Amino acid sequence: MAIVKVKPTSPGRRAMVKVVNKDLHKGKPFAPLLDSQSTTAGRNNNGHITTRHKGGGHKHHYRVVDFRRNKDGIAAKVERLEYDPNRSANIALVLYADGERRYIIAPKGVTVGQQLMSGSEAPIRAGNTLPIRNIPVGTTIHCIEMLPGKGAQMARSAGTSAMLLAREGIYAQVRLRSGEIRRVHVECRATIGEVGNEEHSLRQIGKAGANRWRGIRPTVRGVAMNPVDHPHGGGEGKTAAGRDPVSPWGTPTKGYRTRSNKRTTSMIVQRRHKR
């Protein structure tokens, strides 16, 4: 991959920084693994906005990605690496020995033509998926399941990874990139190595229109609104919020903890907040 600073031919391109990967497939994606998806612009079935700052954007198909990696003992060859508009990581099209093709999250360092394996007998090599029971302590992993057989839910974004810290009984301890230490069942699967496209965070959008292409609408500050629209609104001329930061609905924000899922609290050994 290469970091490309665009020639400043306009104000929008002056600050633009691109991440270019010449190894990505330049043709169309694999059609049998595409699915249609419609945009809701952040509205629910009643037409009410449930997620702000969504709307517009370019149309694209959903790539059906295999997060379970459950074809055990069958070798898979990486046919090509592709861009996926639905996520920050790139994806890899793999061809199994029995003729089936699947998309997977492309791990760091995996190249076209490389052989990948899944299952408890797979070697400890980047891109291979094993139950955590069979992964050595201290190994860097990604695409981690939270429930056995459900599919990977943690460490799936570009450049992310986790570390297997310990195993005790039926649970293992995993340290996530945020600093949180979490318990997962040893039968949950994880992939060796880090997620690829690690330079994704170095890109600079450059102009507001590039976010509109991605379906991201503007974020208006509360102090720029009227009192009817936001607790920070109102005042004569430019004024401060006049209170601690809150959301449009009055909930404290900017660091205020809102997690309420007590059901899985016992699985968190150490929270990402150090205080």
UniProtKB/Swiss-Prot annotation:
GO biological process: cytoplasmic translation
InterPro entries: NA-bd_OB-fold, Rib_uL2_dom2, Ribosomal_uL2, Ribosomal_uL2_bac/org-type, Ribosomal_uL2_C, Ribosomal_uL2_CS, Ribosomal_uL2_dom3, Ribosomal_uL2_RNA-bd_dom
Polar residues composition bias: residue spans: 35-49
Region (Disordered): 28-59, 224-275
Keywords per UniProt: Ribonucleoprotein, Ribosomal protein, RNA-binding, rRNA-binding
Any Gene Ontology CC annotation: large ribosomal subunit
Biased composition (Basic residues): 50-59
Membrane spanning stretches: none
Record-stated family: Belongs to the universal ribosomal protein uL2 family.
Protein name from the UniProt record: Large ribosomal subunit protein uL2
